[in-house]
Design a protein with these regions (language model features):
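Basic, polar low-complexity surface loops/patches
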Residues: 1-253, 298, 305
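Extended C-terminal regions of large enzymes
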Residues: 56, 77, 154-157, 161-164, ...
Length: 454
């Protein structure tokens, strides 16, 4: 038998309808499609018909890692989630990535990925423990936020367990629902949290004690060490060199096996402005334009705990609502006035900050689909524009959502002129786009291709 390096050799398949657990051979695909994204795209081609929608039981929720996952290679903690994505407008095959530690743990448990199909009769979660797999009842965690879900599953299975889960937004099939892992990382784009919810799948908990076999360990280790020395050098990115940036209450952190210190944790020991409980962690990927710093932090916590795509709310839904107010389509939600600037909104920076109370109300309504506004916005602005205000808000999407694809532009200027990636820096990305497996919406290489797609 040929020795396998990098891979474990098995992809887990869980049929929730039939309560059947099987595996398929990774190497059937790996030699031709290289990594988890390519393998999942091939499986989607074989198994997902054009008639399958995002919430159909026959949609596949594929969670994949690659041959480097679980090794010392920088960035090898990443995991990709793929399937027909409800956030896309219209729904189509897409993917979203997340960091953290869940991906390597899946590899250590003996699997190169998971294919989930069907729909459970009642809420369940999947428990993976060193190759042993069970489908267990989630009745006690259904309805919980993502943080409480992780805490509960760790109390059951042990503190060394890694968890991904959907929050109330996913359970309520919000098209902008995320899959959250622990406190700092999420598969934020695509709406895959709602795909979990549609399958009555609350979470996947995993623990593994295995390893990853490397063909030439010494050479590989030398390369990893060389890379680690180059990262923190004076010529490397500043984020790789600086750890603490604001004293004892804030600390930069990183995912497993990664040199980039791009996440942050904020410790707080004081009561929040409008939240009754205390919390410990701030998500640093996106920023809400809020009138107070504490409100901004609490909003990030709420979005992650509800399992909502905070990027979509901050950079898409709220600017669209402010544009709608400027065009006299709406003035308030539940008696709370929608803030909007006096001057026309041309760029994201022109938007008015919102109060913490307004944002907390909006996130709650989205997560639980409360009222006509909450129910519509739970699907994102592109879908909401078709339902609200007689469709008169659809033209206002043009500046925020390229081609109304369902996801707000990412990174390159956050819609409109003023992006910081220009010629010729995006040429390599254009070539990558030509052979990619997904749509050209947000976060396809940070949307640098948006400069040519128009």
């Amino acid at each position: 038998m040929t020795e396998i390096y990098g891979w474990t050799g098995k992809i887990l398949r869980v049929d929730l309808t039939r309560k059947k657990i099987t595996t398929i051979d990774t190497m059937k695909y790996a030699r031709m499609y290289i990594g988890g994204v390519g393998i999942a795209a091939r499986i989607a081609w074989e198994e997902i018909g054009p008639e399958v929608g995002p919430f159909d039981p026959e949609n596949r929720l594929m969670i994949m890692v690659g041959p480097l996952t679980g090794t010392l290679a920088s960035g090898s903690c990443r995991v990709e989630v793929l399937g027909v994505a409800p956030q896309q407008h219209p729904p189509r095959f897409s993917r979203s990535g997340m960091g953290g530690h869940w991906g390597p743990e899946l590899k250590y448990a003996g699997f190169d990925g998971i294919i989930i199909q069907g729909r459970a009769e009642k809420p369940v979660y999947i428990w993976i423990d060193d190759g042993d797999v069970e489908i267990l009842s989630a009745k006690d965690i259904w309805g919980l936020g993502t943080y409480a879900t992780t805490k509960t599953l760790r109390s059951i299975h042990g503190d060394d367990v890694r968890v991904i889960s959907c929050g109330p937004a996913g359970e309520n099939l919000c098209r902008i629902a995320i899959i959250q892992t622990e406190t700092e990382n999420a598969a934020g784009q695509g709406g895959f949290g709602a795909v979990m919810g549609s399958k009555n799948l609350k979470a996947i908990a995993v623990r593994g004690s295995g390893g990853v076999k490397v063909a030439r360990p010494k050479e590989f280790l030398d390369l990893c060490l060389k890379q680690s020395r180059e990262g923190p050098s004076p010529y490397g990115p500043k984020s790789l060199r600086e750890m603490d940036i604001s004293g004892p209450n804030f600390r930069r952190r990183k995912c497993g096996f990664c040199l980039s210190i791009c996440s942050g944790m904020l410790w707080m020991d004081v009561q929040g402005e409008f939240l009754p409980a205390l919390y410990t962690t701030e998500q640093m990927c996106y920023g809400f334009n809020v009138t107070s710093e504490r409100g901004k932090i609490e909003a990030r916590f709420l979005a992650s705990n509800y399992g909502i795509n905070g990027w979509e709310v901050s950079y898409g839904i709220i600017p669209w609502l402010q544009l709608c107010k400027q065009h006299d389509l709406i003035k308030e939600i539940d008696g709370m006035e929608i803030p909007a600037p006096d001057k026309p909104i041309r760029y994201l920076r022109d938007c008015a900050p919102v109060t913490p109370e307004f944002l907390a109300m909006l996130l709650h309504k989205i997560a639980y689909r409360e009222g006509p506004i909450g129910d519509a916005l739970a699907d994102g602005a592109c879908y909401a524009a078709e339902r609200l205000f007689g469709g008169r808000g659809k033209p206002l999407l043009d500046r925020i959502y390229p081609r109304h694809a369902g996801q707000v532009e990412h990174w390159a200027g956050h819609w409109g002129p003023g992006g910081n990636i220009y010629w010729p820096m995006w040429l390599t990305t254009v070539l990558q786009w030509c052979v990619d497996t997904r749509d050209p919406a947000s976060d396809t290489s940070h949307s640098w291709t948006s400069h040519v797609q128009r």
